[in-house]
Design a protein with these regions (language model features):
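Conserved CoA-thioester-binding segment of acyl-CoA-metabolizing enzymes
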Residues: 1-53, 75
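Hydrophobic/aromatic residues within transmembrane alpha-helices
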Residues: 16, 52, 65, 123-124
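A generic "binding-loop/recognition-motif" signal
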Residues: 22, 56, 135-137
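Charged catalytic carboxylate motif
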Residues: 29-33, 93, 100
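Alpha-helical elements of Rossmann-like donor-binding domains used by nucleotide-donor carbohydrate transfer enzymes
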Residues: 33-36, 96, 169
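Glycine- (often His-adjacent) and acidic-residue-rich active-site loop
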Residues: 54-96, 147
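Crotonase-fold acyl-CoA enzyme core
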Residues: 99-170
Length: 170
């Protein structure tokens, strides 16, 4: 099954529930569904607040599924493609979504009902408010321990929210 981001609306509040059994990863399908959810929410002037949460018990979004990203990187290397200011990469869905969430006039709330690492944590950081359900959950940007730069703005948002010293602890 590929990732989903299902939108429900109750009055002025929209709820976006994430589901990607069985690992709880964000993938390209969930990324596309998230952008579509942001489009739908931004098009409805009656919506004043948005709650992002996981639809699986104990899981918000564990992290971005790196298998397709690794395959894409290998394909680009095989074709001799490298980053260039003359040929920038197009904005990925997660970047579009987090940028639009930050710029939105609505209140975005990350209701963290479980683990949120990597891309899931970065999505939560883009929200105005983060609420955490009690439990043994993990949060952070573990990719930095593998010398991989977080790719969805976490390195900028986290220090702004908690300060540089605390950000380094995560």
């Amino acid at each position: 099954m590929t990732g989903q981001a299902a939108v429900t609306v109750d009055g002025a509040v929209a709820r976006v529930g994430f589901l990607n059994p069985d690992q709880g990863f964000m993938d390209r399908a969930m990324e596309d569904a998230l952008v579509a959810a942001v489009d739908r929410i931004e098009a409805d002037p009656a919506i004043r607040a948005v709650v992002l949460t996981g639809d699986a018990p104990g899981v918000f979004i564990r992290h971005y599924d790196i298998k397709p990203l690794s395959a894409q990187a290998a394909s680009l290397r095989e074709r001799g493609r490298t980053f260039s200011e003359d040929r920038p990469l197009r904005e990925a869905g997660i970047h579009t979504a987090t940028r639009r969430i930050e710029e939105s006039g609505r209140i975005w709330i990350a209701a963290l009902n479980g683990t949120a690492m990597g891309g899931g944590f970065e999505l939560a950081l883009a929200c105005d408010i983060r609420l955490v359900q009690a439990g043994d959950h993990r949060f952070g940007l573990p990719e930095v321990n593998l010398a991989i730069m977080p790719g969805a703005g976490g390195t900028q948002r986290l220090p702004r929210l908690v300060g540089a010293s605390r950000a380094l602890m995560l």
